[in-house]
Regions:
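Well-ordered beta-sheet/strand-loop patches within structured domains
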Residues: 20-51, 55-56, 122, 126-130, ...
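Positively charged n-region of N-terminal signal peptides that target proteins for export
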Residues: 1-5
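Cationic-aromatic interfacial patches
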Residues: 23-158, 162
Length: 548
């Protein structure tokens, strides 16, 4: 409240008490600034580089070089949103915050002139362009971090940008416009609240460490249990005690299980090395996980359809959304670190019941052929066929598996098929899809990175029934009947289903409970480095199409 009052008073002095500036003087100086952009492709105000060098000339030329930020309330709204940038994991310094504050203070002392006012107007416009763009798209370009990124950025025309900007200025709705730039979905707003909470915890000293040592088990006594209670109390609330704070009683066990669940650990109630490691992750690291997750959401969630599927890679879960609300979820297995499941978006168009599996060349060369050489009956045991490029079957007794192998190998439909009873296809260049698996026991593991990159689904027939529920003649009974027939059957979806394969290591559920996941593919570090680095970005001359 005090900061807002100071800014308001400063702006009042700036607008109404500062030395008068004639329109002609300001317009001429602004014209020279715009000419500099045209001549050099860049502009610096003081020590602050201007990013929106393609948008700014069009804006000011269209206004005959008149200043924009000349009405009470506009600057306060912009500064308020920039001041809230840390809630989004962003840095106010990226938006000229201190440079603007300094110039406003100077103006309030009556020490400013026409040139300073023009430069302040440019800084404010550039700050607006920066914060609007980064709230919507993120600070970093994901294509610089992930070579297989396929979610495109769509921009509106210059005229749309300027019309929206000027409309927000005219209607006094600048703050609302900027707030609407951020993703309007619960998963984002919940993380914003969690980030505020964790920053407050950090300011209060964070949480205590739990000393390493032997596995702590329910019923035991140890001085470390007292430390454990203190640590859990910070994030999970006070842990009841029966009178002995060093006793690992039932209340401690239940608190440990809740913590393990939230951190994707084996929920056994024991405090072993993995649990101690998770308990002792510094709060600053957890804050960075939230910041990285917010940035990823800004990259992804634009123009999201009402119905879609999210495969949460780091969380090992698949979610089906109806009307943008979670409708169904199941556990999944994802790629091993050296077979990392990629992040991308595509459209699911069909599914196959009782699929065959044509073994990919890499797996064929590294795993299948060596297994055949070791065991002549391997093909029969695995229900596999040797095939030509046209799909016709070759008698394996005529094949020299120790020499050059010009064929493929296909696993036929059946209970032992690596793809199980169904696969879900969303054509993509990475050959990734959802499928059933005979390896059901692995779903009981807390960390489930076991596949070669595709996504194994725990309850695939339930998913098939949900996707086909509006397709005439395809109820669950028919699905089961086709599966029992062991006959390969392709079923086309009436409407394509958007599929997102996403990766984030922090998430908050509808009850406000945050969960942290292991960064299994070591992807967070580059994002945090980029968020902490100086702003290095040229804003586009267009605004995101979804803000038109």
């Amino acid at each position: 409240m005090k900061t807002t009052l100071v800014i308001t008073l400063t702006l009042t002095l700036f607008l109404f008490v500062a030395p008068a500036v004639t329109a002609d003087q300001a317009q001429e100086i602004m014209r020279t600034r715009i000419d500099t952009i045209h001549e050099t492709g860049s502009l610096t105000v003081g020590e602050d580089p201007i990013a929106a060098v393609r948008l700014i000339p069009v804006l000011y030329e269209g206004r005959d070089f008149r200043l924009v930020w000349n009405r009470p309330g506009l600057i306060e709204d912009l500064m308020a949103v920039i001041g809230e940038a840390p809630d989004h994991g962003l840095d106010p310094a990226d938006y000229h915050y201190e440079a603007i504050r300094s110039r406003l203070d100077t103006a309030a002392q009556g020490l400013t002139g026409t040139t300073s006012k023009v430069d302040l107007d440019l800084l404010l416009t550039d700050a607006f362009a920066r914060i609007a763009f980064t709230l919507h798209f993120g600070k970093l370009d994901p294509e610089d971090l992930d070579p297989v990124w396929n979610l495109s950025r769509e921009f509106a025309e210059n005229s749309d940008v300027i019309d929206l900007f000027l409309m927000a200025l005219e209607e006094g709705s600048l703050r609302e416009f900027l707030v609407a730039s951020a993703p309007d979905i619960p998963v984002y707003s919940r993380l914003v609240k969690a980030l505020r909470k964790h920053r407050a915890l950090a300011a209060a000293g964070g949480w205590p460490m739990v000393p390493e040592g032997p596995i702590l088990k329910p019923g035991e006594r140890s001085p470390r249990v007292k430390d454990l209670r203190a640590r859990l109390a910070v994030t999970d609330g006070p842990v009841e005690t029966s009178g002995d704070p060093e006793l690992f009683d039932e209340a401690v066990e239940e608190a440990v299980k809740r913590f393990q669940t939230r951190h994707y650990l084996d929920t056994d109630g024991k405090v072993g090395p993995k649990t101690v490691e998770a308990l002792n992750v510094p709060i600053e690291s957890r804050i960075d996980q939230i910041r990285a997750s917010l940035e990823r959401i800004r990259w992804i969630f634009r123009d999201v359809p009402d119905d879609f599927i999210i495969a949460d890679i780091a969380g090992f879960r698949l979610h089906l959304f109806r009307d943008r609300e979670p409708a169904w979820t199941t556990r999944i297995q994802v790629g091993k670190p050296y077979h990392a499941t990629p992040v991308f978006k595509d459209e699911m168009t069909y599914l196959v019941l009782n699929p065959t599996w044509t073994i990919p060349p890499g797996i064929l060369r590294k795993e299948t052929l060596p297994a055949i050489r070791r065991d002549p009956d391997y093909l029969k045991k695995k229900n596999m066929s040797v095939i030509r490029s046209d799909g016709s079957v070759v008698d394996p007794s005529t094949v020299d598996f120790n020499g050059k192998f010009p064929y493929g190998i296909r696993q036929e439909p059946g209970p032992g098929n690596a793809l199980g009873r169904v696969k879900f296809i969303f054509p993509n260049p990475y050959f990734v899809y959802f499928h059933d698996t005979p390896s059901k026991g692995l779903f009981g593991r807390s960390a489930r990175a076991f596949s070669h990159g595709c996504i194994r689904t725990e309850n695939p027939l339930d998913l098939a029934a949900l996707l086909l529920e509006d397709k005439e003649g395809w109820d669950r009974a028919r699905i089961d009947k086709v599966v029992d027939s062991a006959k390969m059957t392709t079923v086309t979806l009436d409407e394509p289903m958007t599929v997102f394969l996403l990766y984030w290591t922090a998430e908050v559920d509808a009850d406000g409970i945050i969960s942290f996941r292991e960064d299994i593919y070591n992807r967070d570090g580059k994002i945090i480095d980029g968020l902490n680095a100086p702003f290095d970005f040229e804003a586009p001359d267009k605004l995101p199409a979804s803000l038109r």
